[in-house]
């Protein structure tokens, strides 16, 4: 198959964790990967590693520019067959210690950008009678705790948006799924920035390469057995 005929997978939130490993997994399966991140250097690294991939510097909270990037990907690569919405923003702070504007910023990245991406990509998916949209989430999508008033509402809304899309477009050939990752993910950022994570054993973390494998598996499900809500956690995670 010529490179121009290979399907395109679009991934937001490319980094050294879930986003990067998901890009590797889809590239391994023969996809051309359109990668979105805020850091050019990170994108260059993955472009060099994954032949046929292409990086786009984009802050998904800039909704007008996000739409511009979607058009650019369609023109330069082709309409994405798969969207993995992995970009995330969260502030973990008690209500009275935080700032109300945090909620709006988090909402734009976690939820509104998914709406914009879906609104742009779904018409081509409908035309082709196939497509996959997967959003990655966490337990904040299912419950709020004292330190998540600026984060949990945005993830809950993200999940409900995904559910609405699944109910609308599933019968039309588009598979929409929501993956809840119920654990800390083993990345350098998690290890170095969160004090109580530094000395944890690897088995206490969800491994990003394993998450990526599950994301890919879900994207390939047969139409008679599609998943929507999928929960991933290490075997020793309490839940």
What does each model-found stretch correspond to?
Residues 12, 80-88, 110, 135, ...:
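Rossmann-fold scaffold of SDR-type NAD(P)-dependent oxidoreductases
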Residues 15-17:
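Conserved glycine-rich cofactor-binding loop
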Residues 31-45:
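Conserved glycine-rich Rossmann-like NAD(P)H-binding loop of the short-chain dehydrogenase/reductase
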Residues 57-68, 100:
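The beta1-alpha1 cofactor-binding region of Rossmann-like NAD(H)/NADP(H)-dependent oxidoreductases
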Residues 89, 96-115, 134, 158:
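Catalytic Tyr-X3-Lys loop
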Residues 118-119, 163:
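A short, exposed helix-loop element centered on a Lys and neighboring polar residues
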Residues 132-157, 163, 167-170:
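Catalytic loop of short-chain dehydrogenase/reductase
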Residues 171-180, 198-239:
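C-terminal helical subdomain
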């Amino acid at each position: 198959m010529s490179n121009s005929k290979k399907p395109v997978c679009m991934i937001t939130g490319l980094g050294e964790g879930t986003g990067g490993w998901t890009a590797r997994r889809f590239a391994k399966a023969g996809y051309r990967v359109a990668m979105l991140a805020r850091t050019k250097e990170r994108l260059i690294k993955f472009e060099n590693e994954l032949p046929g991939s292409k990086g786009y510097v984009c802050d998904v909270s800039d909704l007008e520019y996000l739409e511009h990037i979607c058009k650019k990907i369609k023109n330069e690569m082709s309409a994405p067959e798969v969207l993995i919405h992995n970009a995330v923003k969260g502030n973990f702070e008690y209500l009275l210690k935080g700032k109300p504007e945090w909620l709006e910023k988090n909402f734009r990245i976690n939820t509104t950008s998914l709406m914009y991406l879906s609104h742009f990509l779904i018409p081509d998916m409908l035309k082709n009678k196939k497509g996959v949209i997967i959003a990655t989430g966490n337990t904040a999508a299912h419950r709020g705790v004292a330190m998540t008033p600026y984060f949990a509402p945005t993830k809950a809304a993200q999940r409900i948006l995904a559910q609405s899309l699944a109910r609308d477009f599933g019968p039309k050939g588009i598979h929409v799924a929501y993956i809840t990752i119920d654990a800390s993910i083993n990345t350098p950022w998690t290890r170095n920035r969160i004090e109580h994570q530094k000395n944890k054993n690897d088995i206490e973390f969800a491994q990003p390469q394993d998450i990526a494998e599950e994301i890919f598996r879900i994207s390939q499900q047969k139409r008679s057995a599609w998943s929507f809500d999928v929960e991933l956690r290490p075997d020793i995670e309490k839940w």
